[in-house]
């Protein structure tokens, strides 16, 4: 993470794609993976670019036709694990491919395999969760709400009954002395045993209608949940791994539609038209709430232990996360026009991979002094 931003962005490369996209970018020091649509808008395309040059290395494409809200492109972020990458399209096509070559190792369509009949107007949005050589997804079938596949073979390890999926991603961690998967289905919050898929607990929020897009966070054995109707809540757990349904902290002003909070030390940050900063040591008390011209309903964020990068409409904001007033200490414009960025960027070292419309950029966030020293 940079501690300052250069006055002007330093472009390493840019690549034009046939379409924009909503799904996040996955990257390491060699490969950049992302999903989009072909020119006809009949096919999903997952694309691998060279991280150094931006040149295309491989792509897979397959027929995927629907009439989803907000377009048909993949919503999820690819999951890189070792020499493989797991890809999930909006219509339920789940692939595991070789990272270096794009060779397809296995494939399932979740909707057809598990007879999913529920209405999914936004498609599959939750990114695959990789745990102990298992690929865990919300399939959304009545007898297969959550499914775990073997990473190597694609065979089903377990499946568990339940409801249609939410539009957020799952998380995993230690809660109440148990390692468990946590997340939302269409209407409830829940926990599942990672080895068997058995549902451990269910919590129905007091106000109906949450889209359940933000991903729950696990913080020191507690669960932080933020949604648009029920606000931001922190829950503790019983010794048997079940949730205590009464929150230990609440903030009813922070009600994000889409943004997942980020925690730095005792401060919780989230964007929902403002940049909010809440204090985890004082009952989620609001420390600051900043309005900025580049902030809307959603912003991706990346943090270290002192700074926060916020990706707004056409600009990057650098925030000092160590002060209660959370000042914006630098900003950098990456587009001359106001562009909504719904695709989560990837930061590898000082290289930022960011999608804006149909263009994928690689920016160097190294300071100009460091850049000159390395020339």
Question: What residues fall within each predicted segment?
Answer:
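Noncatalytic, solvent-exposed loop/strand surfaces
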Residues: 1-375
